[in-house]
């Protein structure tokens, strides 16, 4: 039944996107992307699905380095991604998230300056956090970020020099992700 329900949902969504009417009902379809080691807590199970309505976001990110993301990493990474998308992509901006809460957000003349300002907002909570940058990570930014333990870094790209700096931290996860898109919906289920 899940196969036909998936197919029907795709058809419904196509008609909905191509209509000016507001529907009373909304259906969604997704494909299993990965089964996670555990859910929010170790005794819970969790899975990650890719939505038929989106082509960007954490499920579509490329993991360049590090181990598989956990459920909590995904939640925090998504919070960081949503926050950083609120800022102008032309102005270097960095957001640091811990337990789904911002502990630093700043813009600057350079990405390195933006990171330094964001980190200075709460140097304690930033430890083990998720960092989202709205521009390609450069060598100077990487040299600053590497100074503290970080779980995940999300950015639209990374230079070869920055990659080399991060390689010394094998558990650091680096996600390359489209930040500014016009996907049809943002879907969540708790």
Q: What is the meaning of each model-derived region?
A:
Residues 1-182:
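Active-site loops and adjacent core secondary-structure elements that bind or stabilize anionic groups
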Residues 180-190:
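Single conserved hydrophobic/aromatic residue that forms the stacking wall/gate
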